[in-house]
């Protein structure tokens, strides 16, 4: 992982290019990303930044965390996240520094991680795109049933990982190689091409892409 930002998904809109093409984008607001701890190879065995984002009342923070924020001389945040660093990345940064959207640039490709919308208990048709069974021809009860879930005496059990009904959504998901269309430094906004996981208002973590596109190779 490389240095990144934590933001809040605001929703989707579209912007137009000079040629008149419409590009769907997701607006992400980056709210007060502060470095609370700098981890080094000497002290921790690896290089990383611990980042707090957002604001939280000091009365809502337990004493160990309050002491941690006080040591870094930063306001309490909603949560802490850690970003692993390469050997040459941001070597001069220190605890208390604020990270802003200008660490990314327009046209850069990023990975975005977020918590998907929870959809409750779902059947196999909705959860795994199973086809439905016959509507008629003697079928009166099993239109959306999954069908057989295994064999008989051998193996005498249901295989692990069998696609069945269950909880849908409410899991962390990462979308890769999303292009940054616009960086708004004044309002601390990132406009990222396409849809991102999660509901509006949800937390998203933006990092440099772990893959290279063909045109970048």
From Swiss-Prot:
Record note on modification: Methylated by PrmB.
One MF annotation (Gene Ontology) recorded for this entry: rRNA binding
PROSITE patterns named in the record: RIBOSOMAL_L3
Keyword Chloroplast among UniProt keywords: no
GO biological process, alphabetically ordered: translation
GO cellular component, one term: cytosolic large ribosomal subunit
Record has Cell cycle as a keyword: no
Family matches, as Pfam families: Ribosomal_L3
SUPFAM superfamilies, sorted: Translation proteins (SSF50447)
Listed InterPro entries: Ribosomal_uL3, Ribosomal_uL3_bac/org-type, Ribosomal_uL3_CS, Transl_B-barrel_sf
Keywords, ordered alphabetically: Methylation, Ribonucleoprotein, Ribosomal protein, RNA-binding, rRNA-binding
Positions of post-translational N5-methylglutamine modification: 153
Highest taxon in the source lineage: Bacteria
Residue segments, region Disordered: 135-154
Family the UniProt entry places it in: Belongs to the universal ribosomal protein uL3 family.
Biological role: One of the primary rRNA binding proteins, it binds directly near the 3'-end of the 23S rRNA, where it nucleates assembly of the 50S subunit.
Protein name as catalogued: Large ribosomal subunit protein uL3
Encoding gene, per UniProt annotation: rplC
């Amino acid at each position: 992982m490389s240095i990144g930002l934590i933001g809040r998904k605001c929703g989707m809109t579209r912007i137009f290019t000079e040629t008149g093409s419409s590009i769907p984008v997701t607006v992400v607001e980056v709210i007060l990303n502060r470095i609370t701890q700098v981890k080094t190879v000497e002290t921790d065995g690896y290089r990383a930044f611990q980042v707090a984002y957002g604001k939280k009342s000091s009365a809502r923070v337990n004493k160990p965390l309050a002491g941690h924020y006080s040591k870094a001389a930063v306001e309490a945040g909603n949560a802490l996240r850690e970003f692993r660093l390469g050997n040459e990345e941001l070597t001069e940064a220190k605890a208390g520094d604020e990270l802003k959207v200008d660490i990314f640039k327009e046209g850069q490709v990023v990975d975005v991680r977020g918590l998907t919308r929870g959809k409750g208990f779902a059947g196999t048709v909705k959860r795994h795109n199973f086809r439905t069974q016959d509507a008629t021809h003697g079928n009166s009860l099993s239109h959306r049933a999954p069908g057989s879930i295994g064999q008989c005496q051998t193996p005498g059990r249901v295989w692990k990982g069998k696609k069945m009904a269950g909880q849908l959504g409410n899991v962390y998901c990462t979308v890769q190689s999303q292009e940054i269309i616009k960086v708004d430094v004044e309002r601390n906004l990132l406009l990222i091409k396409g849809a991102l996981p999660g509901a509006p208002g949800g937390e998203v973590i933006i990092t440099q892409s772990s893959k290279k596109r063909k045109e970048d190779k």
